[in-house]
Amino acid sequence: MTAANPQAGDGAKRPFDLVILDLDGTVQDLYHHAPISDAVKSAIAAVQAAGIPVTIATGRTLDYVRQHIAQLGITTPVVTTQGAVVGDPVSGKILSETTLPISLARQAAAWIDAQPYITAFYFNDDEEHIQIYQNRTGDDSEENVAFLDHVFGFPRAIHTPFSPMFAADDAHAPLKFVVVEDRERYHVDVLAELTERFSPTLTITRTHPRLVEGTAQDVDKGMGVLHLCELLGIDPQRVLAIGDSDNDIPMLKVVGLGVAMGNSTPGVIAAASYNAPSVAENGVAVALQDLILRHITA
């Protein structure tokens, strides 16, 4: 574990003004095989009790986050949908939203329609709830169904091909799309293929060992965190952020102190200033204790 010296805020009692945590692979194991640990819950509660707000930045949707973090007592606005949506986890109100331009959504849909990959587009409806459209289901094995339920979320409907969804002049713009990579079957690096085709007009990011996502240009967790800091009136340099996957790298780069989990990708470790233990070893709790709580209680 690599230590760092956080800047003191109010004396040495408030080393940071905000803590931002990734969800999957950071707060909770990647496939949710185990619940959020009591150690992590207690550390988050202690940081918030000390007057430092804690929030979440995730590729998951606002609806999903609201359902899964109530147990953490988080009320600060959250960064969701890969940075495309900042929302209130209590009321569900969307505070900021960035969608793909329809012209680029059409291009992405046309490309996806010509590919064999399982893919989903994500939209917020008029009532600010998420709607997910998936093009195919793949095999009907229990393992595959459980995987897609876990990574895509709900509610989902099958819509194939995608292109007709974007044909009308007033078509609804999507927040993002998610492509499931299957290298064993297709022997294709989807990240490289999508990046070559759509970058920089879209932001293409690997968010999971088997998932590649597309968002609007410059939309990522880093941009979402900057929007959140502006909304809260907080200097990003007074923020601590913890993550494990490549989509966390932009977030770690814009904050004062970036923390990599022990289960992080090499890119995350390179972008971070502090290395915590893995999610299985309660890395979030260890980092919060070392970087915040021990300074407050000293």
Regions found by a protein language model. Give the residues of each.
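Mg2+-dependent phosphoryl-transfer enzymes with acidic/Ser/Thr/Gly-rich catalytic loops
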Residues: 3, 9, 14-18, 27, ...
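A short, Lys/Arg-enriched amphipathic alpha-helix followed by its capping loop at the start of a domain
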Residues: 12-20, 39-52, 194, 198
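Short, acidic loop-to-helix structural element flanking the phosphoryl-transfer center
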Residues: 33-52, 97-104, 158-164, 218-230, ...
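Active-site phosphate-binding/coordination module
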Residues: 38-145
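Hydrophobic packing residues within well-ordered alpha-helices of enzyme cores
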Residues: 65-69, 194, 268, 284
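Alpha-helical scaffold elements within enzyme catalytic domains, especially in hydrolases
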Residues: 46, 107, 111, 193-196, ...
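Short, structured coil segments at secondary-structure junctions
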Residues: 72-74, 81-82, 90, 198-200, ...
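Conserved acidic, metal-coordinating active-site core of Asp-based
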Residues: 111, 118, 122-242
